[in-house]
Structure formats: structure tokens, C-alpha cells
């Protein structure tokens, strides 16, 4: 493979996204009447367009339209039958006509059979030969008729004398019979009269009996009906009384039970009351005693307290007097001020008093109105309550009465419904029984009527058969007599040529069954009809096939042994359908059909033949024949397979062949035939010496056809070359192929020699190569075949034929037929079946019918009580309106009072000790009163039951009279037996027939490509030039003058006619074209007609026109024929040719044909398809492109079409992918490397050379930007190697996803196209997505993944321990390839940060491993990592172990985060960024920045990290709820640093500046 890369302008980012290429719109091309050829039509566009070629199922980018329907003219041309134009030839028949006329005058039945069609000859030589044959046949027919006529005249004279003698004797016998018959008739009349009188008397008695019986039955029925009616009334009343009494008793029992239960309940309640009263009394007496004791104690304590109080009161009163005087003085001054204040406030008070008065008046008015409202409201409510109480009382009474009425009605209804149900049940049973009786009567009647109808039909048939029987018997006996006479005559001639040496009648009529139906089963293989046709068109049978002759013995069966030749069931093949009009070696122009199987030695095919119309055995119809054909395992043919062509007409037999294209020495092929014949009753026919014809057993110098291993007995035909030797039937003594060779008497094929052509069914001496077998029993067999003569006898025993070698090879094949057409002469046939005397049928007995039973009367519906009327509620009175409360005036405030002076506090009076409260005296209990018991209910009085009715006894029925015994009619006299008249000589029937002979000009249509190669039923590419040649055979001598010679060709849909090229290819014709019907017409010019008519006595060669055009559809079949019309007579239709374009599944002519669909899939390095999956930047996509060529297998496109070339275009998105052209590989379907294909890469269409742009433009393809194009260096070699052989190619084109795609993320599309013969087809679009890898870095004070506090950009105190949180990029689920690298690289500032040697790694998302284990988000993953630290440079790299990464399922997402623990050791501002590496591609995180100010408590510089300064502990309080640390490990993994003295306490460190924490306080440790 050559690789070339071309540079040019890049495609615009504005005009192209990451979506894949789409196709250009192709201008539609007209399929008829268009002046411009398809390959000249191009479409250019500056924008991307889409594929429109989906109408055919093929993703075409140019000429996408589906083939339209065939025109009406084309369909009619290919299907409608028309009379064929012929020239009739008359042959003189004067002698034959005179012989027929003489025979008819003599009384011979002269039958003119249908004219025998000698066919339509095509050449003058054939015409002369056929005329000679007809003349000879007419002469023989005239001689045979004259011979029969003379014999018949002699037979008639002898017969008339014998008839006169017998008639006199029969007359005397007749007269005696008539006398006996008269006496018998008189006796019969006497007996009939006596019997009639007895019958009349009996019938009178029977009529009286029937009348008396009817009267008795009527009376009994009336009595029974009356009784049943009374009984029903009694039962209904009895049931009502019983149910009423039962209901009353049930109600009483319920009331008693309820009363008892109620009284039991009351008694129990009274007992409880008594218990509670006793308990209350005891409790009261206890409490009273306690009260009296407590009262005495309280009274004594209160007396002591009173004495103490009086002493303290005296001291208090003295001090009070002093204080009161001092306070009085101060009060006087205060009261003067108060008086002035009071005066001022008096005025205000007066005004306020008026306001109060007004308010009180308003209030009084309101309260009076309110009182009146309340009184009115109470009156209304009282009235409404009284109305409601009255309504409720009435409602209660109504409901009580309603319940009583409803219950009474329900009880009555239930009783009625029960009676109805019982009545319905009884009547249903009666109805069911009556229905059964009706059915039995109907069945009996139907059975009787059926039997009667059958009897009547049988009787009619019997009477007819009885009448026909003597006729049939006579016909049968006559035929048997005739056969016996014929056999006796044949016995005299049995040693003469053509006669059976053992004269026999042929009771098996089995000569011809053209309409038989064939079904096959086999343990071999069925063959497709298309495979058989394909085999005929090849190799040794091709020459005849091209002449429309199916030469079965030339077929090379190796062409039937391909795997795709096998069918699932039988398929018929022959000269029918598209082979109509073809000839076969089996029956010339007659239609022949056969099913084909492929067998090995010992394998069989079983054929069942039905729809037999012409076959009989002993005059009885044969309905079915079953043959089993088995390949004799002893056959010596060299190959392994045998083709059996089994004809649908069983009388034509089988063609068997193991011929592989070469003759074989010492070969043989034998087929065992096992067969059974069946009558119409499907029973096997038991043959009794039935004759089976064994014919056409040819023997040449090197080949012998024979029958062997047969059941039955061989019967030789005198003069035949066929005999029996060593159990084999064949030409035992001489050859029979050619007269004069090896003792052969005649030549088997027709030539000028007398007696030649014996090997045809209608040859008078066909017996020369035939014999017969007498068969008996139901199952018979015979093995038939052909063998090299050397297998039968030594060469020394063989006849010598000059110039021929008896050891020559031969074809191992044979056509043989086994039928009843015995070739011996004058073999009589059994055509009449021996009749059986008919048996008189027996009349059926008339049935006795059952009587139906009457139904019971329905019960009477009860009268229901009317329900009471419900009470009406009195409407409530409306309530009065409530008065509105008044709005009161507000009083004015008084002037504030003067401030009262501060008085001395009076002494506190002594406090009297309060008397203790006397205890509460207990209240005597109130005792409950016991409830009285309920009175017992009163038992009801019950109704008396009614008396049942008594039935009236039935009257006895009268005695039936006995039918008399009648006299028997005497036996009539026996019919006279007359002597049969001698059978008159049968009017012999002679048949004669005329012949039809015609000459017909032959037409043939051929379809060829531009290289003049026959492409009929093959495959050519779309846009190919296809030529139709309209050929006519030589015009025969003796024809009429040709005045017009017109060929009309309705072209197929989708075929683009080229008028100029057609005219150029058709000299001698005027060409016209009808665009509306897509039909082209050729008319011979005057000059051409002059050439045809130059000499009518000689044949003349014709010239032919050629239609030139292109096929423009994918997956289309172009069928075409033409009609020749000469002298405006009936047209002659040509054969139908057809060609198909690729892209059509289920194409019968081209089994490999299917849709043209290039495919594209994306795979990873392991060959897994990753279409639609997420791919990582830096990964390699292995695009696998299929160049779909299998549908072109056996294509026959012309050289100019092939030179359009073969290309494959890969339109890849260069924004996302980097082409690895050095790794591109092309292999064929077998895995072999493909050579002779170059690949070029162009950055855009404009950068490609004009040649490439033209190819793409004509194919309707416009890549979006960069593309690579594969092309065949030598189209012809590529076509021969891959296209014509149908071998698909596979292109693997690796492409690397560009690293920058991981920075931005996004999807990209990829599509390809193949261009074959200038036709473009688009592949599917492959879409993949690249995730954006966006690592993030935070600064945290905890190791809790749930803590989202980030102090990036804030202040960190000196000596604080904190963490860098490195959040890796997320790898989405369903990614294309395994992870093998996922690293965190942090280049920290070692001047400000000291790595403590501790880190942790956690899962950021749920991760699923290949073994199904799920690692939940937040799970620590440190154990799956390693760390590398360079403290000098301030760098740490945390790497996931590759084994762990590869254990992660590609269907799972993946993301991790690392915590690296640091200690701030310096003052200043520090920035930091980390790098996340994923599968070899690096991604930078954001930059974090933190600041550390001077420590006010310790301004010294930080010490070396190995000698840490005093640690700082920060205590903080959360604003609301306390922080809960996550459940992670409390220790970090050691990365090699030995100093781990400082470990941060998780979840308790905070900063003051950005966390809004309260109570921040630092202190020294």
C-alpha cells in the first residue's frame, strides 16, 4: 500500500463542528428520454448536504432513486400471449381422403383425429424433411384403412346369416313365457284384492281405536290439569300459612330471648348498685371519724396563737400613734395642694359625668333591645323545638309503621319468589326434559330422513345400476370376447416382427399423464431450479443452451455440487416459464417439467404422482403412483454424485446422470425403481400379469442400456433386438444403434434410410429396442441403467465396428421411462371394468316419537300493603335580628395629682397567726336505686293449615286392534333365456389424421455490455452501458414478400435510452422513440426490405438493430423483450432477457447480491467495539472500515465502467483526531494483505488534485475537511481480484485522540464512503465523546471528604498543620479503554510548606470493579497507591497502582482525590498548582494561594522543620451545631518521612478570618 499526504487549506472551524461528514445532494437524473448520460452529471455545493439515497435500501450518494414500475407496454410485452406469425405448408393427401370416403360408405367408423402438429420449422432443410415424413405417413394411413374396410365387409355377410337362424328359436321361447306370465298376473290380482279388503277392515278398527284413545287421554289430561291446579293452590296456601306461623313464632321467640337477656342485664346492674352503695357507706363513716379528730386538734392550736398576738398588738399601737402625728402634719400641707388640684379636676369630672350619662343611656337602650332580642329568640327557639318534637314523634310512628309494612311485604314477596323459584325449577326440569325429547325426536327424524334419502338415492342408483348392469356386462363380455379372439389371432403371429412372443392383453393403461402432480422426498439434496439452469448454461451443455435447447445428457453435474445449489424442497425446471418455447431432448417442443435431486450411491428419492387422468387397470381408474428411485451402490461411475431429473409425467420416467464433463471407461449408472399403483380408495393395486413396457434400450459399440433385478417375467417381442440374458434385459445379440453396424437392423435416429428412427414413441418399429415385463402383486421393482460394454462381456465377444474402439469411454447417464405403452403391435387393451351385480338397498324403519310433558302453572303474585305517608316537617321560624352594640364616648383625663409627701412608715402591726382551717366534713353518700325487670312478651295465636285436594283417577285406555296377516304374492315365472345373437362384427374404427406444418421466422433478444459480452441474468454496475440486440433468424425460402419489418421494444424503467448511439448501432432501420411509454421502434428501411426480397426462393440472413443506453438504479432488475411484426401480421415475441444492478437482496439470478453498505466501527486496542463510548484524550481509535464488495460477485461490467475506478474515502474530524497513516492496514475477507491500493491524505477538498475532486463530485460526496482516500492503482486488476470475486476488504485506520480534546471535552463524528464504478455509498456515522478532565485543588484544615470548607485565598497562621486537597478529573462511565495511569503531582513551595510525610486518597465516586465489587464514594483508596517524594525540590507524586486501575470496569466512572498534609513554616504568600495525569495526558489544576502573617506573640523567624517551634492549638466554637467528623482512618500512610510527631486532630481545627467562628483563642502549649 502506497501512502501519500497532501497539504492545503484547513477547513474552517466556523463551518465544521465535530459532527461527521454528510453527503451532497445529487441531482435527479431522468430515466428516459434524457440527452445527457449519468456519468456526465455532477453536483457541486459549498455547503455540506445529506444522503438522500435511501429509496432502494442502499445509502447511495448519487443516483439514489429507486427503479420505477415497469410501463404497461413492457408488462404486456413480457406476459401477454399473442398468436405467432407462421407460414403454413400444405402436403397432398388425395389417396388418404379417398380411402376414408370408401371406408365410411362401407359402414366403417371413420374418425378424423386432431391434426398432428409437425411443429414450426425454422430452416428449409427441416421443411423438406418434414414434408417427406408426412407423405409417407399419408400413404401408410390409406393402406391401413383399405385393409380394415375389406375385412369388415366379409365379416358383415357371415353375421347376417347366423342372426336369422337364432331369431326363429328365440321367438318360440318368448311365446311360452308370455302365456305363463298371464296366469301369474291373474293370481297376483286375486291376492291383492283379498289383502286390500283385510286392510280396509283393519284400518276402520284402527281409526275407531285412535278416536276412543284420544277421548280417554283428553279426559285424563283435563282431570290431571284440574288436580295440578288445585294442588298448586293448596301448596301455595300451605306454604303461606306455614311461613306466617313460622314468622310469628320466630318473632315471639326473639322477643322472649330479648326480654330474658334484658332482665339478666338489669339484675346484674342492680347487684353492682348494691355493692357500690355498701362501699360508699363504709368510706363515708371512715372519713367522718378522721374529720372529728382533726377538728379538735385545729381548735387547740388556734387558741394559743391568739394569746401571742394580743401582746404584740399593744406595743404596736404605741409606736403607731407617734408616727401618725408626724405624718398628719405632712399631710395637711399635701391636702392644701390637693384641694387646688381637685377644684380644677371638678370641672373635668363634671364633663366626664355627662359623658358617662350619655354612655349609660346608650348602654341602657342597647341592653333593653338586647333583652327583647333574647326574649324573642327564646320564643322562636321554643316554637321551633316544639315543632321539631312533634315532627320527631310523627317520624318515629311513621318509621315504625313503615318497618312493619315493609317486613310484611318482604315476607309476602319472599314467599312468592320462593314459590316462583320452585315453579321455575320444576318447569325448567320439565323444559329440559322436553328439550331432550324434542332433540331425540328431531334426531330420530333427521336420522330417519337421512336414511330415507340415502335409501331413495341408493334405490335410484340400484335401479339405474340394475338397468345398466346388463349393458355394462355385455360391453365387458364383448370386450373380453374381442380380446380372446385377438389373442387367438396374435397366437398365430407371435413369431412375426413386432408381436409379443407370449400374446397378452394389456390390462394396465398407463401411457401419458401430462397433468400429473409430483411431490418428492429424499435423503439426498433437493436442487434449486436456478442452479439447474445455471449448470445448463455452462460447460458441456452451454452450446445447446445458447440455442435454447436443454440437452440433458450434456449437462456437467459438477456445476450442481455447490453448497448454494441446495434447495429446501422440490423446485421444478424445464421448458416453461422464462424457458417457454425452448426445446428439450426429452420431448422436442412439448412442455416438460422435472424436479431435481442430487444423490450419492445408496441414496433415494421417493416420488408420489397424483391427479392422474388417463391411467386404468382392468378398466378401473388409477389415482396415485409411488416410485422409489435408488442409486444402485454397485454403479461404477467415477464421481460421487448422481443428478436425478424426475419428470412430473410419470410415464416419461427419469433422467439419471453422473456425467462430469468427461466420458468414462468401464463406467455404469443404475437406478433401482420400486413402485406401487393405487386405486381411488387408496388401496394398492394387486397386479395380475400387467404388462410394463421396457423401451429405448440402446446398445452401441461401447455402451449398453439394460434392465435387471426385476420382479415379474420378461416377454420378448419378436424381431426385437432386446432379449434376456443372465437376468439382464438388453440387446443381447447385436448392436441396435446404426444400421449395418454390429448386426443392427435399423438406425435408432431418423435419417434417409428405410426404418430409421425406431427410437421414438411414434415409430412403427419402436418395438425393435423394446420388450415387456409381466408383473404381479402390489409391489414391484426393476433396476434400469447404462453401462460400458466392457462391464458385460469381454471385448472378444463384442461385435466389431470398423473405426470404433469397443473400450471407448461413455457418458454415465441415461433417460428411461417405465410405462404401459407396449411397443409390440396389435396388443389389445382392457378398457372395461368387470361390473358387479347391484344389491337392492333396505328401506329404513320409521321412528316412534316421544310425547312432551306439560309445564306446571305459575304461582299467583301476592297483594302488597301500601307503605304509610311520611310526616311533613313544620319549617323553623326565622330568628329575630340581634341589636348592634353602641359606640361609647371617651372620657377626658384629669390633671395629675400633686406628689404626696413621703411619710414615715408606720410600724408593722403584728401578724396574727391565721387560724388553721377546720377540716371539711365529709358529705353523706347518695345511694343508687335499683331498676325494675321487664314484663314477659305474650305468645301469638297461629293460623290452621289448609286441606290438600284429591286427584280424580284416570279412565282406562281402549284395546288396540291387531293388524291382519296378508297373503304373499307368488313368485313370477322365470324370465326366458334367449340365445344371444352373435356379436355383430364390431364396426371397426379407423383413424386418420392430417398434419400441420409451418415455417416461422425466429427472433432472439440478447443483452450485452459495452464489450459485447452476454450479460443476460447477470450483474452489472449502476451507470453501466447496456445494449439490447434484437436479432431475427434467416428468413426461409418459399416465403411471401416482406412488405414491412417492424421491431417494437418497450424499454424497462430506469433504463436511460441513448438515441444517437442507438441510431449509430442500427444501420438499415429508421429509429423512433416514444418518451411517454419509453418504447423504441425500429422499421426496416426500403433498402433493407429490398435486400430481404431479392430472391424469395432462397433463405436470406437478416440484419438486427441495437438499443444503447444506461441502467441508473441500485438494486434494480431490467427485464426486456421485443416484438417482431412482419407484413403487419401477428407479432412474434422474443425471449425475455434481464440484468440486475448490485444492491438487491434475494436476487434469484445473483445469490450474492445484497445491499451496498460500507460500514465503519471504532475499536480499542483490544478489538472491542467502542462506538458511542467515551474515549480519553491520548487514546488510540482503531477505526475498522469495511469496503463492501460481496454483492459484486460474478459482475460483468464492461471495461469502460471498470476504468471509472474504485475508491474509499475516510472523512475524519481532524480537530479531534490525529491520523496515524503509518499504521493503516488493508486486508481481504480471508485475512490476506491487500496490495495495489494507494492511500492519500488531504487537509481539505481544495487541496486534492482535480482528478480526485472530479471523482468525489460525480459521486455526490463532499468531505467536510481533512480526509484520506484509498484508491485502486490498477482498476482492472483490483476488479478481477476483489470485485468480481465478491471479496470484502477491511481497512484498519488508527487515529489518536488529540490531547487538547481533554482540555475542552466534546463529541466527534466519523463517516466513510466507498466509490465503485463511479457510484458512491455512505457508511454509518460513528460518534464518540471525549470527557473534559478538570482537576481541582483546595486547601483544607480537615481530612474529611465531606468537609467542603476551602481556605484558598485566606490566611493560615504560622505553624498550622493543613492539607492540600487534590481532586482528580472524573472519568465518565462507559469509557472505551482501561485506565492504566492516574497520578497526582504536586510541586509545592518547600520554603513555606513542610510535607509531614502523611497523605490519604479517597474515592470521589462509586467505582465498580470488573469482578462486580462496588467501592462506594468516600472509601479510602490509599492502599492502592504509591508515593514518591523529593523534599529538596518540594515535589510529591501519588500514583495509583496499574493493576488496580486495570481492575476497574470500563462501564464504571472513576474519580479520586488526595489529601497531602503540610505544615506552614514561613511567613509570606504561597501559591501552588498540581498536575493530574490520566493515561499519559497531563492536566493542570487551578492555583491556590494562602498568606501567613507575622506571629505577634513570637516575631522570631520560623525554625528548621526538624526542630519545630511550639505548636499552635486553635479552639473554636461552631455557630450552631457541632461538627461531626467523617468515618475515615485517623492515621495517614507514611511516605518515608520519619518525623510524624505532629498529627492534626480531625474536625477541630478552624480559622478565624473566613469561617465566622466564635470564641477564637490561641494559647501556648
Swiss-Prot record:
Which parts of the sequence are annotated with region: Disordered?
42-81, 827-985, 1486-1511
Q: Ag I/II A repeats located where?
A: 146-220, 221-302, 303-384, 385-466
- Protein name stated in the entry: Major cell-surface adhesin PAc
GO CC field:
extracellular region
Organism (species): Streptococcus mutans
Query: Which parts of the sequence form the motif LPXTG sorting signal?
Result: 1532-1536
Localization (cell)? Secreted, Cell wall
Q: Which Pfam families match?
A: Adhesin_P1_N, AgI_II_C2, Antigen_C, GbpC, Gram_pos_anchor, Strep_SA_rep
Q: Where is this region: Heptad repeats of Y-[EQ]-X-X-L-A-X?
A: 203-448
> Which regions are flagged for Low complexity bias?
42-54
| Known function | Surface protein antigen implicated in dental caries.
Gene behind this protein: pac
Give the Basic and acidic residues compositional bias ranges: 72-81
